[in-house]
Amino acid sequence: MFSDVVILAGGFGERLWPASSTENPKQFMTVTDNVSFLQTAVLRALAIKPKGKIVIVTRKDIYTTVALHCKELLARLSEDDQKKIKEDLYILPETEPKQTTAPIILACHFLNKIDSSFEHLVLVLTSDHIITPMERFVSDCNKASIAAKEGKFLCFAIPPVEPATGYGYIKTGMPLNDDGSVFEIESFVEKPDLETATAYLASGNYWWNSGMFGFTCKTLIEELKKHQNDAYSAFEKVPDMAAPVFEYAEGIKFVSEWPAMDEAYSKVPVIAIDKSVAEKTDIACAVRSSFNWDDIGSWDAFEKLFDHNIGKTVEVECKDNFIYSDIPVALCGIEGVVVVIKNGRALIMKKGKSSLVRDVVKQMKNSNV
């Protein structure tokens, strides 16, 4: 199984505005069982029982909120898991957001720096997705870790359930193991149009790219050197520089000072790990995941998580609406809308129009609304 887990928690989550915003992004939103997206990611990390560390890489301006969510999760955990959080979970604040390559390579150097006694086998998780059931996730991670330990760059491929145009796709080739769960990757495909996505769905060998990965730190560093040398060279001096300094926020360890990171982040390019490594390497492979997955990237997706409104609501002569509000809301004679009122802001959206939310946010910023 993977020895360490890296959770990427630096996103902004504008597609779920106004509940998600720059200062209070999607990963902090409450979902099922009254836990946040971030907390469910930590639960997944604990479920694979890593012998090493759990590292949450996040933005410098929200690391204290990350710590608070980790602290609040403790009451739900067993004694062993509480101990794991207190002893082996670290928050690593980025000096500035720089897509996914920078935080991932930073986390690998961090793991090597604080414990060089073994080869770190790393699972990279997102902080804002829904994955069920946990048992299948753990089983798939075990299969993935075997391939990653053998020197592969492992991607988690999700079986598509609809011709989605909002995801990148992975085209898989021949199986690489006996049970047919791990496959070679023939190509990565950008977000397609509807006609192309429909053809992908019918073909049976195109899968959604989940944004979750597995590899050894050694493998990742070597592949960056080959395929994205400017990212590799930005961190080249980190192993020889001083170790990070730790402090506590809400009883959770975080890196308060690490000059090596500051220097590296001033040089590293802004690029996704998909572009820097996954699409270029010849050692990429994919686990065809058996678990259910949803990135909940829109209000249309989010409202499907619930069979009821969230907040104090009254509806008269209404149907097929979803309300998510922190103040009382009343609707009269309304049909097929999503109403979101959070953080002093409101969104009223016709169902099926989630793709317009980012445009709204952009226009509001430009208009200084």
Where do the model's predicted regions map?
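A short, charged helix-loop
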Residues: 173-207, 255
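A residue-level structural signature of the nucleotidyltransferase/glycosyltransferase Rossmann-like core
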Residues: 122, 186, 205, 212-213, ...
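Short beta-strand segments
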Residues: 7-9, 57, 123-126, 155-159, ...
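Short loop-to-beta-strand entry elements in the cores of soluble alpha/beta enzymes
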Residues: 52-54, 204-216
